[in-house]
Amino acid sequence: MSKIKGKIVLITGGASGIGRLMGEMAQEKGAKALVIWDINQESIDATVKELGKKGTVHGYRVDVSRHEMVAEQYDKVKKEVGDVDILINSAGIITSNKTFDQCTEDEIKRTMMVNAIAPMYVARQMLPDMVQRNEGHICTIASAGGMMSNPKMSVYAASKWAAVGWSDSVR
């Protein structure tokens, strides 16, 4: 609890699913402020309204696969909310449930961008500030898909294996 209490927590993909649950848990553990990054404005608004009843919540529409947008929105968060103490990379997508030979180039690119490369973009923005303060935590949510093969979700599995390998390597 002491690692979250009084801290600013930023969660990518924080307006739904596991990201939203992580936000609820951060609030329960005493986070000073919760920052939600998500691509779906309607979900952001609903989450800010609901979780805002329990504490300070800020919502930003961010496509984490666009590094320029990540940099711009991170600067905005620092000005409007403060230094991020805890980053939870939770944004993720599944674009198909088919064998690799049936996946389109766009499905492959989008899945890898959001699930594998975006966590790196986001962490790369925040890590220098955390290092300078000698304080901060980065948590990347993957899935069992990052630990085992799945013939009908090979691209998803590859993206999550990449996220797991990268996260383990930078800790």
Roles of regions detected by a PLM:
Residues 143:
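Residue(s) in the substrate-gating loop at a strand-loop-helix junction
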Residues 98-100, 104-109:
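Substrate-binding pocket helix/loop in short-chain dehydrogenase/reductase
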Residues 123, 159:
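Active-site helix of classical SDR
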Residues 41-42, 61-72, 105:
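The beta1-alpha1 cofactor-binding region of Rossmann-like NAD(H)/NADP(H)-dependent oxidoreductases
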Residues 31-46:
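Conserved glycine-rich Rossmann-like NAD(P)H-binding loop of the short-chain dehydrogenase/reductase
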Residues 100-101, 150-154:
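Active-site loop immediately N-terminal to the catalytic Tyr-X3-Lys motif
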Residues 2-34:
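Canonical Rossmann dinucleotide-binding motif of NAD(H)/NADP(H)-dependent dehydrogenases/reductases
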